Structures are given as structure tokens and as C-alpha cells.
Amino acid sequence: MNPVKFYLLTDTHYFEESLGVEGKAFEDYMQKEQYFMKGSSAIIKSVFDRISKDTETNIVIIPGDLSKNGELESHKSFIKELYALKESGKKIFVITAGHDYGSAFAFKNDQWIDVEGTEFSALTDMYKDFGHGEALAFDEMTHSYMAQITENVRMLAICCDSENQPKGAMDDRLMAWAKEQLDKAKADNCSVFVICHYPIIPPVPVFDLVGDTKVKEWRKVATFLADNDVELVLTGHMHIQSINEFYSENGNRLIDVCTACLVGSPAKYRKITVDENAILNVETLDVGDFGGVPEGVDAQEYFDNQFRNSIVTRVTRALDGGKGIVKHLKKLGKKFVLTGKVGTLGRILFIRLDKSLKNKPIKDLIGEVGLAIFTGDMPYVEGTPVHTALCKVLKRFSFVIKKVEPKLQKGDVKTDLKEMLLNTVGNNKGYSDNNAEFQLKK
């Protein structure tokens, strides 16, 4: 791949605060939200200001979910920030995604309120100065485009989150259009990397079993890209830090660098460099203090506390509702999650746990493991107390797993649920999800 250097940030979820971020309904909503609505503008301004001062890196790429939920005023305010960044000398390339059009809302007087949203068709004109306005090719149906990034490098922006096709799908028509652009680039001796809002490769193994966490038919899409000389794809959507490799049956490799939400934990963005020797360097940068962190509070901890609490809230709210015995069991489960200790769970399952886990509240462990997965470089590898405990739990339920695995199988790819779960909580890939180097083809 030819040399190129740029900043990568995604899922900015800009929200225009004048629309309404107050009241009981807002506070209740934020209990389960990973990222900040109130403060998103300050976070983005802070990061853009930092990027604008880097005179050696002049390209900025943002693969989708630019606004909170398609609010027209949020788009207008975010575009002003993009223009300010562009005036500092940056070339900016964006794509839009599902949160950039459709139903929009805000909060006022303790209630949810509807606010003016944005039509998908309007996004073309709104963001024309940030990518597709000067594109070599533009697909009207999806807003995908091919752009000349440097003299010898092109970027294929695949938008598979449009209103004109199933979300997360790269259908045959779009694939044929992409193939045409890739063939033209090859004929012009240009390297190509891809951006797509949806991950191409599941960010963690267990996401292969979860819908809407990666493109549909991801192996087919990954094979198509790898076998058409694309080695690098940059993605978002899942608000997670991950780097994964895929090899096609022809032996061609695709690297998917998925980046977290900018305005919420883990609050990261990337600096990507491919040098003259085709060495890909992925560097992760912290959002850090943006001027809205309470005095005396560490910025990263401020972000992480919001995420940990949101994970626990989502788990406990899932235990609400039901009827009869189901409602009663859910109520007991919710109380156990909120007040129970890991050691008690171990005794119930007849498994021996490490001393470091016995007195840990269950809700704290849930928050810690969830945060670790989304931050990347998951620490619960072989030999750690959590890994050992999970192995014992999986062994205890092995009879259930054996019955479930065949039902989870997709095509010829067998499902090993134990390995999936262990490799989801522990990074066993041999490289970091945050800072890594790869040798690409020259």
C-alpha cells in the first residue's frame, strides 16, 4: 500500500444542546446511555482543536453516526465545526449512517419531545464539502463514493446504512459498483483502503452471533474486499476498540480497525500511518479533559463511570417485566445482580473462585468486564481469576452448550461457544486492539 497518514474518529453523535437536555426524562435516559449528549459539542470542539494544531497530518476521516439521532440542528452545528476544522487546512471525509436521519428527539420539562429531523436525501447536499462533493464516483442510492486521498491512494467509502437497503447490508448491486471502482483504481496504480460504518469483521468473537454488530454476510463481504486488493478497512458503529484480521480462502488478508465512540467511554480516536515501506501503524489517542469534567475527577474515569453504570442499568432493566413466576424470578435476579456478591454465585454453582473475586459485587464485575471488552486489549486471559472462573462456569454448563452450539452454526462454520466467550473477554490475538503495527503489501 502506498504511503498515507490521517486521523480517524467515528460515532461523534453530536447533539445540539439547545434542543433540550434537562429534566427527569433526560436523567432517566442517560442512566442507560454509554455516551454523553450533554457535553458532546465540547468534546468534539476539544478534539478538533487538538487535530487542527497538527501541521503534519492533514486528513481527517469520520465513518458515520455524525449526529445523536438525525436532529437537523445537530447536523447544522456539527457542520459548522467541520468547516472550522477544514479552515485549519484539513481535508475531511465523512459518511453518514443510521443515526444521521430519521426520528429525532430531545428532552424538556421532564418529557421526551420530538424535534425536527433530517431526511436521508438531504444529507447529500449537507455534507457535500466533506468527501463526496469532489468524489471520483458517487452512488446516489447509498451515498457511497470513491475519493482520491493522495496522489496514489484512494478511499472507498461504503455506506451500507442507507434507507434504500437493509441496514448493514452490502448487496450485489453495491458490490458490483464497488468492484468497478476498485478495478479503476488498480488500473490507475492507486492503492485503496475502505471506510464503512458497520464493522466488516465482528469486533469480538461473540458478536458473530449477535445481529447488527457487523455487516450482513460478513465473510462474503470480507472475502470480496480482500480478494480485490483491499487490505485495510476502517469502521465504527459498535463503539468498541478492536483490530481484527481475516484471511480469504485465496490467502488474502483484510485488517478491520474498528474505533470507539468519540463522545463516550472508552473515548478514543486514532492516528493511522502507512509509511514508505508499507508498514501500517495504528496509534490510539485519548479524548481526555474537554473542559466539562468535574473538578478533581480524572477525565477517563469520568467517561468510564458513565459506561459502567449504563451496562449495569441495561442488565437490570432487562430483568423488569414479565408475568407470574417469570416476573417473580426476574425480580429475584435483579435483586441478586444489584446486591449479590460473586462468591455467592460461586457457591450456587458449586465452583471455587479466587479470593480476589469472592467479595466483589456482581454489578461491579459486570461493569468491569463490559468496559474491558469495549476498551480493547481485554485482560482476562488464561491464568487470570476471571478467565479461570469463566472456564469453570462453562464446564458446569457444558451439557447445555453442546445442545446450543448446533443451533448457532451458520453454514459450514462450526460454533465453538467456549472459545468464542473466552476470546471475547481475553485478547489472545498476539497484538493490541489499540496500538499495533502490520506489514502490508508493497
Per-segment meaning from a language model:
Residues 72, 76-177, 250, 271, ...:
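Extended active-site neighborhood of metal-dependent phosphoesterases/phosphodiesterases
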Residues 11, 60, 65, 78, ...:
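Divalent metal-coordination and catalytic microenvironments
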Residues 13, 66-67, 98-101, 199, ...:
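Catalytic metal-binding/acid-base residues of hydrolase active sites
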Residues 283-294:
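Short, solvent-exposed aromatic-acidic interface loops
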Residues 49, 53-59, 91, 154-156, ...:
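His/acidic metal-ligating clusters that form di-metal
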